[in-house]
Amino acid sequence: MAAKIRKGDKVIVLSGRDKGRTGEVFEVRPAESRALVRGVNMVKRHQKQSQSQEGGIISKESPVHLSKIAIVGKDGKPTRVGFKIQADGTKVRVAKRSGAEIDG
């Protein structure tokens, strides 16, 4: 199945602790149906000291399930994603709310 949410997309969290927060997807894990969104679902992790890194407690992003996030449309509201095949045979993602193409 084609990916509805991809790296670089601006998304909004639909439910959970971070509901309503927006961020950019910087990693997608299709096998787990999860994505990492910058600044969303932050957790504290204990980092052991190494030669290159200092030890201590660091904050990092935890994966969010794809069903809990939606792409932000041009109007700033969450939208579902559909697909459209153009005349030249290329498949593009389309915002269901507005009908606008998401990627060119």
Swiss-Prot record:
Key words of the record: Ribonucleoprotein, Ribosomal protein, RNA-binding, rRNA-binding
Any one of the GO CC terms: ribonucleoprotein complex
Superkingdom of this protein's organism: Bacteria
Record bears the keyword Hydrolase: no
GO molecular function, one term: rRNA binding
rRNA-binding in keyword set: yes
Biological processes per GO annotation: translation
Main function: One of two assembly initiator proteins, it binds directly to the 5'-end of the 23S rRNA, where it nucleates assembly of the 50S subunit. One of the proteins that surrounds the polypeptide exit tunnel on the outside of the subunit.
Assembly mode: Part of the 50S ribosomal subunit.
Family label: Belongs to the universal ribosomal protein uL24 family.
Protein name: Large ribosomal subunit protein uL24
Lineage: Bacteria, Pseudomonadati, Pseudomonadota, Alphaproteobacteria, Hyphomicrobiales
